[in-house]
Amino acid sequence: MIVISNTNIIYSCFYKPEGVIATILKNRKNKLQFIAPSYLLDEIEEHLPQIMKKNQLTKRQAKTLLKEFTKNITFYDLEDIKRENRDKAVKIVKEIDPDDYLFIALHLEKGHKIWTCDFELINGLKRKGTISVLLQEN
């Protein structure tokens, strides 16, 4: 099974580096395959100072953990996703969380479920009834 990892899945790994989510992501023998838009890395970088502060990590430690958590994820650049899917995704999430449009666009492009623990996104997509989501409790 292939799943699209949402950014908050990676965030949760910093707070529980030995937790279920981090263990699943780090397992190379996993039957799950992970994909994500490369925007996920940009979003993590943007919030890295807060992550470092809350978890008492140096920049080097945070970067090492990020590499470990994302080593089994295949990333897709913006250009890898058709414009029509990006445009449709923008419309779907405009009232939920516009920052999540690339995850939705990748879902529209590839057809895989989105793995997330973002309840705002989950509930918003459920109301629209258009996107398959895998809920992950922290």
Language-model segments: residues:
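A generic structural signal for short hydrophobic patches within well-formed alpha-helices
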Residues: 10, 41, 121-122
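Residue-level signal for well-ordered alpha-helical positions
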Residues: 16-17, 47, 127-128
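Acidic, PIN/NYN-like endoribonuclease modules and their adjacent C-terminal/linker elements
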Residues: 36, 104, 108-138
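Short, well-structured N-terminal submotif of metal-dependent ribonuclease cores
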Residues: 1-36
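Active-site neighborhoods of divalent-metal-dependent phosphate/nucleic-acid chemistry enzymes
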Residues: 74-119
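PIN-domain endoribonuclease scaffold, especially VapC-family toxins
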Residues: 27-31, 35-87
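Short amphipathic alpha-helical segments and helix-helix/interface helices
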Residues: 21-25, 63-66, 103-104, 122
